[in-house]
Amino acid sequence: MITNARVLQEDFVPRDVEHRNPEVNRLSAALEPLLSGEPAETPLVFGPTGAGKTCIARYTVERLRERLLDVRTTYVNCWTDHTRFRVLYALLDAVGQTVDVHRQSTPRDELLRRIRDRDDAPFVVVLDEVDQLDDPDLLYELCGVPHLHPILIANHEADFFAGLDERVQSRLRAGPRVQFDRYGLDELVGILESRVETGFEPGTVDRKRLEAIADAAAGDARVAIRVLRAAAREAEAAGAEALSDDHVRTAIPAARDAIKQRTVDALTPHQETLFELVDAAGEIAPGELYERYAEAVAEPKSRRTVRKYLSKMDQYNLVDARGEKRARTYAVVD
């Protein structure tokens, strides 16, 4: 049934994108000055999970590489690489400058100096989940490197800027905004149809099943593609020649569980502690949660940072933030 499993992987970037032409155009316009030897703008990409932010950013960078020979690019997930060292190491690794870098002995300033000194070509860097950086001041320093051109991706603009000091805010506020909204049902069906055409045998998946998958995904392309993947595996395991309603029904909860587990696995140690405390409590107020968290870890983060962590887990459907301000509580999403 599946002829090209690559189209069902989360990091797959299609040759042609669906329903995001305005966003592609805005990102392309921000990078356009590089084609004439001028510095790019610093685009700020916002939107909910599964809205195509990462895919479109990587797609736009790939199209830039086709037009500009002398350019370096890389992608960094700041949820995984959330420390200053890991981000700088990832950037240096992309340009082959990490052979003699050691986590314990190499001075942190040395990493940034190497990036500054290597100015032989424009360096376009996609910083995904940038609101997860332990040290947001790093953005100020990176934006000050003349040949380095970041694309910053986060979920909510207000939450992102709330975590920055005035100096960093001032440097970033001039950047063009690229706002992504959730996909509509027909848009998700179109995305799935494109994946099916590229990666499945003809006649194995009909539109009715794709509509059921898109409806269950509720605007989230990650969920839709994961359900399609799980349903196809169910069908292949059963020796079926085509996707059925039963395959889709079985795949929906399995796909959601897989996405949730993947997100839980990506949590930092402090986030994981918070998640476990919320899970153990059933439902808990922010003040009590912070007290338990501060007792559970050796070096607790600030209350503001903890609020940022909880907001991120809410955005990724791990916890449910109920109520407002003093009446707010948190509970784990079933």
Task: List the model feature ranges, each with a label.
Residues 1-41, 135, 330:
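A short, basic N-terminal segment
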Residues 39-59:
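Walker A/P-loop nucleotide-binding motif
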Residues 42-44, 66-79, 179:
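Conserved catalytic segments around the Walker B and adjacent sensor/switch elements
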Residues 291-334:
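Terminal-proximal interaction/regulatory segments of ATP-powered molecular machines
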Residues 61, 139, 307-311:
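Short, hydrophobic-biased segments on the C-terminal half of alpha helices
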Residues 281-288:
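Short capping segments at the starts of secondary-structure elements
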Residues 201-202, 208-270, 301-305, 322-326:
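C-terminal helical "lid" subdomain and adjoining coupling/linker elements of P-loop NTPases
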Residues 57, 80-164, 170-172, 180-188, ...:
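Mid-core helix/loop region of P-loop NTP-binding domains shared across ATPases and GTPases
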